[in-house]
């Protein structure tokens, strides 16, 4: 029987003080991307475009030809070399007229492939209805598994800028990426210590209002703020991707002694040393596993998620079974951490 293992990746260290820059844990409110969207046509396809019965595509071709003074009814157009597509893009903050941005193209009709075609000039609109960019370009993609979508690097040119006067602002707002009362106060106190009292004030667990010192412009102030190191507290969290079989966890999340049963699997977690037996295996970090009785011992020390997952792998538990056991441990209170199942 094929065994499915989950790989335990320790890339996050939770529930401890972590040294980071303020710019890594907080964003500046108002400084963000804006989403753009447009409807267009991809031409030059070798019979892989929308079928002639696709009325909205034929009408779009007719409208495009009419824009260049070629009048023809949509009913008279018979072509499989054109595909109707939607174009999406992100307009970065402070993008200037003439800048280039990447675009993503997706077929919306019954085309078989848009690879090798050319996107004709397409306006990209924001939620306010205004045109902010024009998209156009050849579609070249090495992704043979998906023939109905593609990216064009620098495929759109900015035509309209989002007006935002940062230079003359006196106050801005920082938004913590992971809201936390302690972290908000930590940012407030750190900034006040560096720049002087009343520069920063925490409004809630997520929001810190900052006021620039008179000697600095807002651009200079934010540049300094983002580089200031800070110790912040992150939450204990376990993220489980059941499809890919990946568990992301802090290295020091403790699992308390317990007996957990899920489906046909029972695992005993204890700090008591195991009796020597031919079924006992030594794991890392002074842990031992009795495979005959599914008992995991830390030999007097704390057991972590790492040890539990390794033990489950040793006794041949499937990916689905591991997820079920981790959920049972969380529900029973044996794990003091948030759990997110993807």
Swiss-Prot record:
GO terms for biological process: bacterial-type flagellum-dependent cell motility. Residues 1-15 form the signal peptide. The keyword Transmembrane does not apply. The keyword Signal applies. It is found in: Periplasm; Bacterial flagellum basal body. InterPro entries: Flag_FlgI. Its main location: periplasm. It comes from the Bacteria. Pfam families: FlgI. GO terms for molecular function: structural molecule activity. Keywords: Bacterial flagellum, Periplasm, Signal. GO terms for cellular component: bacterial-type flagellum basal body, distal rod, P ring; outer membrane-bounded periplasmic space. The basal body constitutes a major portion of the flagellar organelle and consists of four rings (L,P,S, and M) mounted on a central rod. Assembles around the rod to form the L-ring and probably protects the motor/basal body from shearing forces during rotation. Belongs to the FlgI family. PANTHER family: FLAGELLAR P-RING PERIPLASMIC PROTEIN FLGI, FLAGELLAR P-RING PROTEIN. HAMAP family: FlgI. This is Flagellar P-ring protein. The gene is flgI.
């Amino acid at each position: 029987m094929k065994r499915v293992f989950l790989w335990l990746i320790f890339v996050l260290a939770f529930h401890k003080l972590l040294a980071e820059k303020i710019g890594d844990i907080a964003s500046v409110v108002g400084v963000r991307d804006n989403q753009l969207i447009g409807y267009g046509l991809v031409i030059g396809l070798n019979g892989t475009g929308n079928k002639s019965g696709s009325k909205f595509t034929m009408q779009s071709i007719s409208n495009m030809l009419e824009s260049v003074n070629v009048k023809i009814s949509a009913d008279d157009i018979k072509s499989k070399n054109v595909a109707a597509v939607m174009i999406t893009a992100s307009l970065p903050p402070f993008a200037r007229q003439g800048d280039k941005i990447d675009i993503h193209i997706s077929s919306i009709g019954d085309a078989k492939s848009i690879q090798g075609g050319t996107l004709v000039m397409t306006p990209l609109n924001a939620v306010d209805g205004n045109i902010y960019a024009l998209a156009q370009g050849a579609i070249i993609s090495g992704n043979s598994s998906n023939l109905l979508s593609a990216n064009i690097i620098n495929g759109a040119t900015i035509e309209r800028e989002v007006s935002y006067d940062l230079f003359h602002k006196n106050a801005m707002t920082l938004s913590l990426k992971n809201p936390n009362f302690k972290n908000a106060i930590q940012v407030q106190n750190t900034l006040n210590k560096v720049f002087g009292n009343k520069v920063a004030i925490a409004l809630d667990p997520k929001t810190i209002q900052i006021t620039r010192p008179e000697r600095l412009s807002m651009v200079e102030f934010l540049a300094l703020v983002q580089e200031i190191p800070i110790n912040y507290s992150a939450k204990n969290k376990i993220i489980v991707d059941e499809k890919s079989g990946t568990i992301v966890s802090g290295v020091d999340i403790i699992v308390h002694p317990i007996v957990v049963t899920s489906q046909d699997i029972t695992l005993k977690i204890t700090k008591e040393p195991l009796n020597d037996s031919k079924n006992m295996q030594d794991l890392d970090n002074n842990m031992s596993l009795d495979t005959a009785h599914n008992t995991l011992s830390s030999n007097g020390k704390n057991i972590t998620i790492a040890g539990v997952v390794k033990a489950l792998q040793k006794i041949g538990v499937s990916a689905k079974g591991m997820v079920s056991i981790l959920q049972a441990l969380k529900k029973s209170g044996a794990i003091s951490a948030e759990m997110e199942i993807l």
